[in-house]
Amino acid sequence: MSGKPPAIFLMGPTAAGKTDLAIELTKVLPCELISVDSALVYRGMDIGSAKPSREVLAAHPHRLIDIRDPAESYSAAQFRTDALQAMAEITARGKVPLLVGGTMLYYKALIDGLADMPPADAAVRAALEAQAQALGLTELHRQLAEVDPESAARIHPNDPQRLIRALEVFQVSGESMTAHRQRQFAESSGADAGAGGHLPYTVASLAIAPTDRHILHQRIALRFSQMLEQGFVDEVRSLRARSDLHAGLPSIRAVGYRQVWDYLDGKLTENEMRERGIIATRQLAKRQFTWLRGWSDVHWLDSLACDNLSRTLKYLGAISILS
């Protein structure tokens, strides 16, 4: 093993069983948990994000859960800063950071770093969110293609958070996000843990998922139905009662929340909301698989196996990550 301290990434698609395995690992290894999930950062968004229960969190604390109000944005850059601080604190106590979740952009930000982009501008962002509401995301994507075609080619037209951020960077700085990244890459050769540097840890990357994709789809449908039974609609209704929340915010655009919001807006029937929520979650899982297929040195585990804890411990022992 190198001189860098160890860290463990436990990745995988939604509904794969990441949290359960992570908790089992903390019972036998000197690990502390860090959540890697863009929905779990928001307070008051518990049911639709499949947030661990209060009892579970009390027994097995996760850092970076409930750290933002739904009216606030939370970027990959902010996550990287927060996660690096949490990892350093855990390491200083002689423990191992165990990062668990499915927001693959956050993992990539940790591993590869991020270009040093201009900070968020609340006024510019509000104006862009208003445009998105009034004109639609297709128009924002067209605007981005005019000023930053490279970013437009990378960002899906239905990804409001990344579209708005790319346009925000251009409007605030006068330079495209692509130009910022290219300059940062040229300047940051040899950097370590800065915004554009690499992660100063030796990482064991694990991914868990059912080998049968049909099983994952069944799990997704079952979990969405369970969320509805647990009061998901009422949770979103409470969010809608706040005057500072709207459908253009990153929190409300989260999978599941946007479909229930549209249902409460009268845009969808209950059956349509359920169907679209399940489809959107399956699409999220597909994107997560796409990220993971391109991930180097990842060790796969089958969600359906009954001995994943022992398999994980055997793998970690084989690569001497904790020695």
Curated annotation (Swiss-Prot):
InterPro entries: Dimethylallyltransferase, IPT, P-loop_NTPase. Its cofactor is Mg(2+). The record marks 103, 125 as: Interaction with substrate tRNA. It is an enzyme of class 2 (transferase). Keywords: ATP-binding, Magnesium, Nucleotide-binding, Transferase, tRNA processing. It catalyses: adenosine(37) in tRNA + dimethylallyl diphosphate = N(6)-dimethylallyladenosine(37) in tRNA + diphosphate. Substrate binds at residues 14-19. Residues 37-40, 161-165 are annotated as: Interaction with substrate tRNA. Its EC number is 2.5.1.75. One of its GO terms (biological process) is tRNA modification. The keyword Iron-sulfur does not apply. Belongs to the IPP transferase family. Monomer. NCBIfam families: miaA. This is tRNA dimethylallyltransferase. It comes from Pseudomonas putida (strain W619). The lineage of its organism: Bacteria, Pseudomonadati, Pseudomonadota, Gammaproteobacteria, Pseudomonadales.
